[in-house]
UniProtKB/Swiss-Prot annotation:
Name under which the protein is recorded: Protein PsiE homolog
S-S bridge residues: none
Keyword Cell inner membrane: yes
Span of the signal peptide: none
Single GO cellular component term: plasma membrane
Similarity section: Belongs to the PsiE family.
Membrane-related topology note: Multi-pass membrane protein
Record-annotated membrane-spanning stretches: 15-35, 58-78, 82-102, 108-128
Keywords (A to Z) from UniProt: Cell inner membrane, Cell membrane, Membrane, Transmembrane, Transmembrane helix
Subcellular locations according to the entry: Cell inner membrane
BP terms from Gene Ontology: cellular response to phosphate starvation
Length: 136
C-alpha cells in the first residue's frame, strides 16, 4: 500500500474503533438496565408462593448471570486494549447451555448432547487458559 493512503487508513480505523466503542458503551448501559429489571423480577419470583416459581427462580438466576457475563465481557474489552478475550465467550456459552438444560429438559438425548457441548466448551476453556494460548 502506498504511504499516501496511510493517514486515510489510520483515520478510518480510528473512526470505526470510536463507533464500535460508543456502540458497546450503549449496549453496556442497556444490559445494566436489563440486569436491574431481572433483579426486580427475581425478587418478585422469590416471594411468589407458587411451586412453579422455583423453576422460574433458577431460570432467572441463570439469565441474570448471562447479563452479568456480557457486562463483564464489555468491561474486559475496554480494560484489555479493545479486544475480546475468547474465554469470556466460552463462559457465556457454558452458561447459555446450562440455562437451556434447565429450561428444556424433556428429551434425555438432547440433555446428553447439551452436556457433551458443555464438556467441549470446558476443554476449550482449559486450552485457552493453558500457557500456550494465554494472552493476559
Amino acid at each position: 500500500m502506498p504511504s499516501v493512503y496511510r493517514p486515510l487508513v489510520n483515520f478510518v480505523a480510528k473512526a470505526m474503533q470510536a463507533v464500535l466503542n460508543l456502540a458497546l458503551l450503549c449496549l453496556g448501559i442497556i444490559l445494566v438496565v436489563f440486569l436491574g429489571k431481572e433483579t426486580l423480577h427475581l425478587a418478585h419470583v422469590l416471594f411468589t408462593p407458587e411451586p412453579v416459581s422455583k423453576y422460574k427462580l433458577v431460570e432467572g438466576l441463570v439469565v441474570y448471570f448471562l447479563y452479568f457475563e456480557f457486562i463483564a465481557l464489555i468491561v474486559k474489552y475496554f480494560e484489555s486494549g479493545f479486544h475480546f478475550p475468547l474465554r469470556y465467550f466460552v463462559y457465556i456459552g457454558i452458561t447459555a447451555i446450562v440455562r437451556l438444560i434447565i429450561v428444556d429438559h424433556e428429551s434425555p438425548l438432547a440433555v446428553l448432547i447439551y452436556s457433551a457441548a458443555i464438556l467441549i466448551l470446558v476443554i476449550t476453556l482449559w486450552l485457552c487458559n493453558s500457557n500456550r494460548l494465554k494472552r493476559e
